[in-house]
């Protein structure tokens, strides 16, 4: 039934996906368990008890019992030639014969598996989970929908409209399927204002109480009563998973609409699921980030010739075989993500009118009331447009993502849930107060620096200051009217002036004792006379008061005028955004003072230049200093820096990787690749067709010059900045040397502040303290708007389950609620989930205000958070693809072996090997390794090397990158075409071939050159095939590229198609990097979907009370009832085992290494944090989670501990103790 419906909705036969090797399960009926009476092959090495199993490469595999339960009995051993080829490959890379310590076997009886193999098992589970929602979707597609009502009811709550438009109030729309859209008046907060829905039988509208009932003000705190009811009662007694039938809600960016549905905030999960047309569009015809910029440029008419964009980022990747012009057909089969463009792509017709939306964005509630009918029609048109898009999308989606696990996984991903309590509000308050306090302290430090700098005016000392010499030091003279001459009384001229005696007078040296009454009276008279004298001068003041006369110009610009409503004393306008601030703080880069250039942005001055000390500026285009630069002072400053650092000359040294880079999830690594412009120009294709060796191209501005320092290398020198005695170097920009740095306080420079490269100069503590505070507040400054605007709904006691209210830890005065993260379940072309706050949040750091954000997600009493990180997920996926491609054995490639058997302690893991090969830190090597797997080219490595170690020259970075790629990715080799073989024979050309018949790039170019010369420069296609050879990762990249360049790229496990906008038929040889990246990242999404399906099955099968919370890249978290926590942990371990086995099975590897079968640890905790032992101490949480919030450390359990606690069973029993 389910398969027929799937085919019916898809409109095409469901593809079976990649065909694995012969199944090794004994065929069984759907309900039969996997038989387990077979034995491993006799030639397989095993222990005395028959459980320990090693493959021919001596890698420990699943124990015999687990292998039989999952893969069945029997199995073919790889042929001797494949084994020998693998051993020789491992020997070549120094990995064969490395010692390995066997892991204890895992004795575990798995739940009953269905079908004849793992693929059938997952298909049956996913079909069971998604079938009710697929049936609901089919009812929408097949229905003849009613016409839109001509008039909309002005009534609070839901209204149903009959066939003739008659309005009838209803409690909720009792429908199995709805297309739904919510509109919010942003001026009034996050409370929903109105909504429209359509079902196969009727239209519905909803109006909020705040819209219908006019009040002076409403509370800003949301309660369930403010939200839209859509799924029954909100009382805890009736809100269980078993209540009601399955409901499907369809919307465009439906996670926004879900956040305004009342029942979705209940702790117990509901049976309502959501399908997002925006996510389905990304999976069907989504655009990569660079394609989107091209598409938008073409749409706006800014670039009539899209080929002009080839100078940027991704389009100029490796061309597949030649440098022929790019294809732009992909622009016709894709679009941006908004509803209007998506509707135009799939449906066509007149463009959607989006102007009324501005009333919700900028208007007030009164504006919405006055335009109620028009705005309801606008919302209804969006609903109808979404329905039309859905009609076209769903069959396409099921055809291009045919495995039912994909749909079931996306449905589960769409119900993310983050529980919070009163600590959330406390966190917001503490973080904001700490931020404001530090802001005030930083402001005072900066004002002190400005006031101190003014003192340099005395004796013109500023002229010898390495930073302040070029500021505006001109003084504004004090102006006054001419005074009228008045004859002074003689008595006034004879008044004694207090303190006017000569210096050294005894009256200044001795204590005169307490003043007498006469002296007191005399002083009072003197003060009064002086005051009168000052008052008499008021007539001399100019009509328009001067602004701080007697102060330098730069200082006057920092002080508000007296008539300014926001007047405050001193240089109160000073901020980090001002160009004068880095100078006042005396910032240095490696000991060189920072300097700002109008044409090149922020840089620094390197002393030692002599060729421009006497020469005037060459031309008007050359920047020159209007005042003399104190280059001697700069030389002295740098010498002092070198002595303090204990060095006479800079030497290249490794800089530790900032935690921000490591804490950025690996999914963000692809964004880093794109930001750095890592994608190679069509250099390879040009090299194949040319007779020139590959040049090392330096940026024009950084080309060797006649004048440059010998002791310093950097981004420069830029000699058009003519500073006498100094060279100007630009600060390095994360996007490349051609970009200017606008502020040295940007977050990209935080790692340089931490490692001491960028620091405040000498002269007091104000500068270093301001720099330190800037680092501390950087996270909250950038994220507080997103965090503070999170939509939190607090639940009344009646909506809380009894397990919460009866728990000893329940606080009667506390608040319990939830945040629904607005996750786009497929927000990128790789189908990765996207959400701006929670999916990108870093972990807590002791020097970052508010960075304890994730720990504020706290389980309610009686519940815990159970989750785990998938160890090296993408590395393993890439490795197992390479292993299957090379010899069909786990660990048969060097890359696969290091992933499985490598140990950090022995330096044999992937990251340690790369670090040792290139001479970089292991942390840096980790970034490079992920970048390569994501498809980044050698240019990426060069730029990232220079970003991590700015002291490297471009030549040194290029050499390191070339060495790294030669060892890891290998060298490109080519197989000659028939024409190529004929030319070699006819021209009698000497060609050096490998054992497999591959030729080098040099030989390929030689054949092309000679053939062209002998045939009057005819162009010959002499290469039929190309591959990577000789590297630790060559076979893996060959497999990834073979998938990426196939006619219809599909993920190897679930068979999901790449976006139509990246199919080879429309992009030809372009966007190779995006396509290679897609293979790994999209396979990782398959991994997540398999996990979600398996966990849902085990929770339902064994009555584990829990629900999915969130998935952050390679980790998953579930909210689980406390008494079920250990069973949920075991379910997670079994899920990981079956998911990895599914990958191996689909690739023809009917086995799995023991080292990757289970999570290294499953976390059981009361809050969301990276490690259960992290106390999350930060400036806003200085005492930690336990002392401040009462949250103790959690548990991290491995598979052996979990089996001991649960007796290896998922069945419910009396709860074991910890």
UniProtKB/Swiss-Prot annotation:
One of its GO terms (cellular component) is mitochondrial matrix. GO terms for biological process: base-excision repair; determination of adult lifespan; DNA replication proofreading; mitochondrial DNA replication. A motif (Pol C) lies at residues 1113-1120. Keywords: DNA replication, DNA-binding, DNA-directed DNA polymerase, Hydrolase, Lyase, Magnesium, Metal-binding, Mitochondrion, Mitochondrion nucleoid, Nucleotidyltransferase, Transferase. A 2'-deoxyribonucleoside 5'-triphosphate binds at residues 869-870, 872, 874, 922, 926, 930, 1114. Residues 31-50, 484-524 are annotated as: Disordered. Residues 507-520 have a biased composition (Acidic residues). A motif (Pol A) lies at residues 866-875. Its EC number is 2.7.7.7, 3.1.11.-, 4.2.99.-. Residues 837-843 are annotated as: Trigger loop. It comes from the Eukaryota. It catalyses: DNA(n) + a 2'-deoxyribonucleoside 5'-triphosphate = DNA(n+1) + diphosphate; a 3'-end 2'-deoxyribonucleotidyl-deoxyribonucleotide-DNA + H2O = a 3'-end 2'-deoxyribonucleotide-DNA + a 2'-deoxyribonucleoside 5'-phosphate + H(+); a 5'-end 2'-deoxyribose-2'-deoxyribonucleotide-DNA = (2E,4S)-4-hydroxypenten-2-al-5-phosphate + a 5'-end 5'-phospho-2'-deoxyribonucleoside-DNA + H(+). Belongs to the DNA polymerase type-A family. Heterotrimer composed of a catalytic subunit and a homodimer of accessory subunits (POLG:POLG2). Interacts with TTC3. Interacts with LIG3. This is DNA polymerase subunit gamma-1. It comes from Mus musculus (Mouse).
